[in-house]
Every structure is written in C-alpha cells, then in structure tokens.
A protein has these predicted regions:
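A short, N-terminal amphipathic alpha-helix
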Residues: 43-52
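Canonical Radical SAM [4Fe-4S] cluster-binding loop centered on the CxxxCxxC motif
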Residues: 1-43
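Leucine-rich repeat
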Residues: 41, 71-72, 97-104
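Class I S-adenosyl-L-methionine
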Residues: 1-5, 9-12, 36, 64-66, ...
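Aromatic/hydrophobic pocket-lining residues that form the small-molecule binding cavity
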Residues: 38-41, 70-71, 126-129, 155
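N-terminal active-site wall of soluble small-molecule enzyme domains
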Residues: 69-79
Length: 195
C-alpha cells in the first residue's frame, strides 16, 4: 500500500538476472538495454522525488542483488523519507556471499522497508539457504507464484519451511497468461480454490 500523497515507482535495475523463470514478465525489457544505466536510474529517482516526494520505490528486474555495488549506488540516490522495497530471488554468489548480503541489509536497514524474496514450489533458480533469510536486518516477505502444475499437496510443508523464521508468505497466481478477457474466469484456474 502506498502512503497518502505518494505513488509507487517501479525501478527496473539496469542489468539482467540471467535467470529464466518461466513466469517472468520482464525478460523482454532486457533484450535491448541501450540507454539503460545506473546513472539513468539515479536521474529518474531524483526526478520522481521532485514530482512526488512521498513515493515508494520498488527495485525489481532483473535481479537487484546480482550487481551489489550498482544496487548500493541506486539506494544512495534515494533521499530520506521514501519507503524502499526490493524484489529478489536473493542469489548468493562469490560476488555477493551471505556475509555481504547481511552487511548490505545492516547498512541499509533505515532505508529498506521490506525485501520480497521469491521462493517457489518448484525450483527455478539457485536459492540461498533459508537460514540466511532469518539473518537479514530488514523485514522479509516470501513471494510464491503458483505456476502451472505446482504441487498442491506441498503447500503446508512449504509454508512451514518459512514459519520457523517468522516470515510471512504471499501466494499469488501466475499472471503470464492473464488478459482482460480471462481475468475473472475461474474454470481451469488451479490457484482459484486456494487464493
């Protein structure tokens, strides 16, 4: 929910995640990255701050954490007073090991409102270990897309997996085949009995 008088500004990070999640609706945005840079993103952040100084910023992609130094530059461009959300698969790599992720959240804990971490019933990307999620210094929420033939009978175990860390879970439907014409159709929608 956006604060009164504000707006939600979605910031597509200017680098591709190199993942291939089948439900991703942003991949085509990265086919032609011309004119897409950290500097341009910072210009846009400053412009939106001038237009709507109470706006929320949502970093998504791509994968915001795949280039941590660039993400920090963009975070530093956001003036105080804005809520900041990061949508991520939270990859752990040699470039961004667990200790560095924890340090990033510690350094930005007064700026980050919540990190929304994608976890799914079927694995599509390399995931960090669950213990790391409980060690982050900012609020965390798990986002789970109920994509195609996800295992219904595994939902309780999936929820329990994160319950021990006190992490809320948002289940959402797969939007990749949603059109204005079929938006309210429930027949054949495997997620409608659950959602």
């Amino acid at each position: 929910m956006t604060r009164e008088g504000g707006a939600t500004v979605t910031v597509f990070v200017p680098y591709d995640c190199k993942n291939h999640c089948p439900f991703c609706i942003n991949k085509q945005e990265y086919q032609n990255p011309e004119g897409f840079s950290v500097e341009k993103v910072c210009e846009s952040i400053r412009m939106f701050h001038e237009i709507t100084p109470k706006c929320d910023f949502v970093f998504t992609g791509g994968e915001p954490f795949s280039e941590p130094d660039a993400l920090q530059v963009m975070m530093d461009c956001i003036p105080e007073g804005h809520r900041v959300f990061i949508n991520t698969t939270l990859p752990v790599s040699d470039l961004f090991p667990a200790e560095r992720i924890i340090a990033f959240t510690e350094r930005n804990k007064d700026k980050i409102t919540c990190i929304n971490i994608s976890r799914h019933m079927v694995h599509y990307v390399e995931e960090c270990n669950d213990e790391l999620l409980g060690s982050l210094k900012v609020p965390v929420r798990i986002n789970c897309v109920l994509f195609k033939n996800y295992p219904h009978d595994g939902m309780i175990a999936f929820a329990n997996r994160f319950a021990k860390y006190g992490l809320p879970i948002q289940f959402r439907a797969d939007y990749t085949i949603t059109t204005p014409e079929n938006l309210y159709e429930r027949e054949g929608d495997r997620s409608s009995p659950i959602l």
